Amino acid sequence: KDEFADDFGVVFMQGACGDITQVDNTAAADVVMSGPAVGRKIGLSVAGETVKLLTQMRFHESAPLAASRKLIHLKPRQPTDEQLAWAREHVASDEPTPSWWSNEGFWSRSWIELDEHNKIEPEVPCELQAISIGRTAYASNPGEFFCALGNDIKRRSPFDNTFIAELANGCIGYVPTEDAYEGGYESSMCLSSKMEPGNGEIIVDETVKLLETMTVPADAPV
């Protein structure tokens, strides 16, 4: 707004970044990687690049608009009977550990919470949306979507440019690629990582189908 005009509209959409973090896990312990100062640094970096791009843009008086949506239902992960038995045995554990990651009490509570939540919501509603402006499309989903899944949508989209907007119209937790379930932070089973393996690929397929129902105008600006 300072650079262009007070009535200049800014829309921020979070791309597919479920497996991206600003945290450098190899850095020294005293390196600050979160908080207002880090947020401002990242924000100014993005804003600076955006201003550079805007000065090079060609603007058009009009462009055709279209929108479509679809509601799908996904299967959540379910702790096994053995995992739940272990969880109930260790849920009261307050044994000190180096981090929450290795805390038995944390994981016990997480698995019990997930099991109870699944009884209330045996299927997870997932709203997908697609909006096109000319030959450019925006596709949204409510997950913390892994980069590779977003890139797959872009590669298969019929539009010249396709942008992903994650955590839109809800939050269904992390949505990893199928091979990411071999291990790691984002795919460790809990209420914030409740997607069954393969759900990410289902979202990709359904999003591409949604985009394919929309007409790409031949003579519209990109």
Residue ranges and their predicted role:
Residues K1-V222:
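Non-catalytic substrate/cofactor recognition surfaces at enzyme active-site rims
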